[in-house]
Regions:
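Conserved alpha/beta-hydrolase
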Residues: 111-128
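Alpha/beta-hydrolase active-site loop
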Residues: 138-156
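Alpha/beta-hydrolase active-site loop signature
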Residues: 97, 124-127, 196
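Bacterial Sec-dependent N-terminal signal peptides
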Residues: 1-29, 210-221
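Catalytic-loop region of hydrolases
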Residues: 25-116
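Glycine-rich nucleophile elbow surrounding the catalytic serine of serine-hydrolase chemistry
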Residues: 167-177
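Alpha/beta-hydrolase fold nucleophile elbow
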Residues: 159-169
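Alpha/beta-hydrolase
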Residues: 177-289
Length: 289
């Protein structure tokens, strides 16, 4: 009869709905199942890892305005590398997107040293953590710190050991600000290369690069190389353009300006990354070198 057909159809639809959920649950390990059951957590997906027995990417619901829930919410992307429930946890505080943490071989320095879990939190308004519609009024440091606090409070249900916050560059700044706003959230804070800027134009960097970093002799070697690049610009620019084309780099300015900018920025980049001063080409080097 019509009623029996409706019941059969309903059972079929329920079966089609439940089976994918069962298949998903079967793919999740112990940590993944606990993660998926946490409030506000959604779209838990298994990732491959060469360093961790379980790894997942998921989303967590965050308020746009940390102090006013009526303003709406968005989904923030988080990557979890699970080592063990009895292990410490490293909370990586980003300043930009976090897609690098999706890589199969991803591991963080402090996690290597202390054999920890890793929770990498993508910064709001970047990549997959972009609110829709996009209202830039809510892209504030304070709101980003409440994002971290919410992730911390939610995942503390799984990881009750020591917590370490860490980040690099703008992520390192986030680590410092997070400690200032929520001093009891983590046990240790380890910012890497994190500037504490006095303003948009700070003024201290130029003096440091010109007068203080390394030795006078080494600073002169860097400057001499920059001047050499400008003297040979006519010969080097076609090579530079070819290199950028092969790497599929795209710029919003003429390639000659990009060349100049790269030369001007060389001193900052050189001292930032700590290259071997002996490898810098001198006046007798060929254009290819």
């Amino acid at each position: 009869t019509k009623m029996k057909l409706n019941l059969r159809f309903l059972k079929l639809m329920l079966l089609l709905f439940i089976l994918p959920l069962q298949m998903l649950a079967a793919e999740l390990g112990e940590a993944g199942k606990l993660l998926a059951a946490l409030p506000g957590v959604s779209d838990v997906e298994t990732l491959k890892s060469t360093h961790f027995p379980e790894k997942y990417v998921f989303f967590i619901k965050q308020q746009l305005d940390a102090k006013d829930a009526s303003k709406g919410s968005f989904e923030q992307r988080v990557i979890l590398c699970h080592r063990g429930f009895d292990r410490p946890t490293v909370l990586v505080t980003e300043g930009y997107n976090a897609k690098y943490a999706l890589r199969e071989g991803y591991i963080e320095e402090l996690s290597k040293l202390f054999d920890t879990n890793i929770i990498t939190v993508e910064y709001r308004y970047f990549d997959k953590s972009m609110p829709s519609p996009c209202n830039w009024d809510y892209l504030t440091v304070e709101n980003s710190l409440y994002d971290l606090h919410h992730v911390n409070q939610t995942l503390h249900a799984m990881y009750k050991g020591k917590w370490i916050a860490t980040g690099i560059s703008k992520g390192g700044q986030t680590t410092m600000f997070y400690r200032a706003y929520f001093p009891n959230d983590v046990d240790i804070s380890v910012p890497y290369v994190a500037p504490l800027n006095k303003g948009v134009e700070d003024g201290r960097h130029e003096k440091f690069l010109q007068e203080e970093v390394s030795t006078k002799e080494n600073r002169q070697k860097v400057l001499n190389f920059q001047l050499l690049l400008f003297r040979r610009k006519a010969a080097l620019l076609p090579m530079f353009e070819k290199y950028c084309s092969e790497k599929q780099y795209r710029f919003n300015a003429p390639i000659a300006e990009i060349f100049d900018y790269s030369v001007f920025e060389y001193a900052f980049a050189f001292w930032q990354w700590g290259e071997d001063i002996r490898k810098i080409p001198t006046n007798d080097a060929t254009d290819d070198q």
